[in-house]
Amino acid sequence: MTGPPNLLPEAPPQPGRRFPATLPAAVRVRRPTLTALPLPRLARAVAILAALLVYVAAFRATWIDDAYIQLQYARTLLESGTWGFYAGYPANTATSPLNVLLIAAVGFPLSSVERAVTLLTSLELAGLLWLLLRLSRCLFGRDFLGWFGFVAFATNPLLLSTIGMESLLYALLFVAALVCFIEDRWSPMAVSLGLLTLARPDGALLLAVLLPLATAPLRRKAAALLVYAATIAPWFVFSWVVLGSFVPDTLVIKVGDAAWGATSFADGLALYLNRYPLETLASLLLAPLCVFPLWQCGARIVKTVTVLAAYGTLHFAIYSALGVPPYHWYFVHQLVPMLLIASIGATFHVVRSAGTPVGPWLRAAVVVPAVGLLALAWNEGFPFDEAPINTNWATSTQYRGIGEWMRSNLDPTQAVRVYGEIGTVAYSSDRYMVNEFSDMSFADGLIEQASYAALPGIGPLLAFNFLWRRDHPPLPAPSFEFVPVPPGDGPPGCPLDDPACRMVREGSTEWVGTMWLSVRATE
C-alpha cells in the first residue's frame, strides 16, 4: 500500500518520520451537506447550547464599559434606525459594525439587546466548537484539538473579559477563514475574511497573510479578492459617504489618547502582568504548549502554524508602531493565534503518545485550559462582579446605578458632559451623555486637530478617507457634568461647600481601587 500512514498510530512515530504529512482518505474532512442532523446529534447540539447559555449568563455582571457602547448603538439602531448613540445624531465610534448589526438583529425578536448578547455569545462559542472540531479532523483526523481548543477559548479570562464586544465573533470568523484556507475553499474563505474585517478592520491583516502563503493560481486569488471586496463594500461605502470615514472615528480617538502616559501597546503586557498578575498568567497558561517540534509535522500543520504566527506578529508590529494604548481587548489578536498553536501543540503530544502508558492520561488533558479560570474562581469567588481583566473606573453594576439615578433625577432633555467612561451610564440613563464617543462634532474637531506627521505617507490616505466628511450638529448643550473626583475618607455624598454637586457615588475596581464619581450642575 502506497497511501499515507495512519494518523492514529498505536506506537510513537519513528525518529525522522514527519507527522502527519497528509490525511488518509478515511479521515479526510467531508464538506457539509444539507441533510438533516440525526436526532442524537441534534439533541447533543441543543444540550451544548443550553449549557453555554447558562454559562455565559453567569458573566452578566462582568461586561465592560466599551461593550455597552456597542449595546447603545444596537438599541438606537433598533429604535430609530440611526447609526449612533442617539436618535437623529449619527456617530462613528462603534469599532465593530458587524457585532452591532448582529446584536440589533437578534435583539429585535428578543426585545432586548442584553439578552441578544447572551444568546450571540453562546452561539459564537458553539460555532467555535464546530469549527475547531473541523480543524482538528483536518489536521489530525481526531477530535482532541477541537475540544481542547474549545475549552481554551471558552474559559480564557482575557476573552471572557470582552463579552459584549466583538472578540469572540472575531475568533469565530478567524477560525472559519483558517479552516477554509486549509481546505482550499476560496470563496467561503473570502466571505469569512470579509466578515472578519467587518467585525474589526484588523481582519484585513489576515487576508494579507493568507494570500502570499497560498499556493493557488493567481486567477483564484484574484477571484477571492473580488468576493472579499463584494462582502465588505456595502458597509465601507456607507461608512465613507454617510459617516465620513472608512474606519471608525475611534482610530483618531484611541491613537490620540494621552490617558495612558508613556505606556503603549508595545509594553502593555508588562502593565497587565503587574496589575493583574494571576489573571494575565491564567490567560497565558497554554503559551508553553506553543513550543513543540514543528519540523516533525506535516506540511498542513506547518502551514497552519506559520499563518497563525505571522498574523500575531504582524498585528503586534503594526499596533506597536502606531503607539496605541494597551486596551486589553487589543491583545486578543495575539491571544487567538496563541491558543490555536497551543492546541495544535497539545494534540501533537497526545497523538505521539498513543499506545503508550501515558496516552489515556493525556487525553484527559482536554480540561487543562480551564485550570486558570478555576483558580481565579477559587481565589475571587464566582460569579465574578467585574471582568477578570479590565481598566474601568467602576463596575457595570455601579455604573448602572449611576445611570438609573440620572434617569430618575434628570429631565429627558437635559444633557450631561462626560469626562471618562460613557457606555454603561449612557445605556442605563437614557439621557444625552456628551463626549467624543457620542457627539460626532467632537470627533470632527479631533480629526481637524490630529497630526500624523510621525506616520509618513499617511496624509494623502487620510485626505481620501475624510473626503466626504462634513461637520455634524452637536448634541444638546450639557447642563450637568459627570466627573471623577479623588477618593477621600468620607462617605459618598456631595461636599457641603459645593452647591453645584447633585450626586456622588463610589466606583471601585481592581484597576483603580476606590474613587468617587459625581454629577455636578454646570450652570
What are these regions (language model features)?
Residues P15, F19, L23-E523:
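Membrane-proximal envelope and lipid/glycan-remodeling enzymes
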Residues M1-P9:
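N-terminal acidic, proline/glycine-rich, low-complexity intrinsically disordered segments
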Residues E10-Q14:
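Intrinsically disordered, low-complexity proline-rich regions
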